[in-house]
Design a protein with these regions (language model features):
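Cyclophilin-like peptidyl-prolyl cis-trans isomerases
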Residues: 1-247
Length: 247
C-alpha cells in the first residue's frame, strides 16, 4: 500500500492507493514518480460532484482551451470491484463512454476525486431500482443483438405478430437470466457512507475506484466550489504543483 502527496495551488491532498487495484495503483505511482502530473490542471470541476485532473495537455493551456482528451497512448484494464465505491474522497479513473469503450477501460492518466452529496434511504432505494432496470435492459439488448437478423426479417415482412412473439420470448429469457444474476444493490456499508458522508453512488460499477483521500478532503471541498466556465474548466487555474510518493 502506498500514499501519494498531491501538492496543489490550493493546498495539499494525500491519497492512499488500494492494493486491490494493482494495475491502477502501479500506473499512478509510475506517473507520479516521473513527475508526469507536475503542472497539470484540475481541468474539469463540478460542484457537488467531483474534481478531475491528469490531462497532460492542460500544462500551460491558455484560457478557454478545451481540455480532457489528453493522456498517454494506452488505457488500463478496468478493476471495478463492488467493495470499492464512490464515497466522498474516492480516487477514481476517468474513461471514455461505453459507446466507444464497452470494456470500461480507464484513461492512462486522467483521474477524479469524488465530492458528491448525501442521499436519503428513499433516494438510494430508487437508485437501486434504476440499477436493476439497467441490468435488465443490458441483458435484453444483448439477447436482441443475437437475433438481429430475425428482427430485421420480421420488420421487413411487417410481421407484427411475429415481432410481438419474439419480444415476449426475449423478455422471458431476460427475466430468467437476471433471476440467476446478483441483483444490483448497495451494501449496508455503502448505504451508511452515502447517507452520512456523501458521494456519487450512480457511478458505482461504471468506473474504477483505486484509492481514497487520507488527508486534505477540505482542499477537495474548496476546489469543487471554484467558479467554472465552458467545459466546467475553472475560471482561475488550479494546478498540481507536484506529487510525492510515500511508501
Amino acid at each position: 500500500m502506498a500514499n501519494v502527496l498531491i501538492r496543489t495551488t490550493e493546498g495539499d491532498i494525500t491519497v492512499r492507493l488500494y492494493d486491490e487495484t494493482p494495475k491502477h495503483r502501479d500506473n499512478f505511482l509510475k506517473l507520479a514518480e516521473e513527475a508526469y502530473y507536475d503542472g497539470t490542471l484540475f481541468h474539469r470541476v463540478i460542484k457537488d460532484f467531483m474534481i478531475q485532473g491528469g490531462d497532460p495537455d492542460s500544462i500551460g493551456a491558455p484560457a478557454g482551451k478545451s481540455l480532457g482528451v489528453g493522456g498517454p497512448d494506452y488505457t488500463i484494464e478496468a478493476e471495478i470491484l463492488p467493495s470499492l465505491y464512490h464515497k466522498r474522497g474516492a480516487l477514481c479513473a476517468a474513461r471514455q463512454g461505453d459507446e466507444v469503450n464497452p470494456e470500461k477501460r480507464s484513461s492512462g492518466s486522467q483521474f477524479y476525486i469524488v465530492w458528491g452529496k448525501k442521499y436519503s434511504a428513499g433516494e438510494l432505494r430508487q437508485m437501486e431500482k434504476q440499477m436493476q432496470m439497467q441490468q435488465e435492459q443490458t441483458v435484453f439488448n444483448g439477447l436482441a443483438s443475437k437475433r438481429r437478423d430475425m428482427i430485421m426479417k420480421l420488420r421487413r415482412e411487417r410481421d407484427m405478430a411475429g415481432l410481438s412473439a419474439l419480444q415476449d420470448e426475449l423478455l422471458a429469457e431476460t427475466h430468467a437470466i437476471c433471476a440467476s444474476m446478483p441483483k444490483p444493490q448497495f451494501s449496508a456499508e455503502q448505504k451508511e457512507a452515502y447517507a452520512n458522508v456523501g458521494g456519487t453512488p450512480f457511478l458505482d460499477g461504471q468506473y474504477t475506484v483505486f484509492g481514497e483521500v487520507e488527508s486534505g478532503i477540505d482542499i477537495v471541498g474548496k476546489i469543487q466550489e471554484t467558479p467554472t466556465g465552458r467545459g466546467d474548466r475553472p475560471t482561475s487555474d488550479i494546478k498540481v504543483v507536484s506529487m510525492e510518493v510515500m511508501r
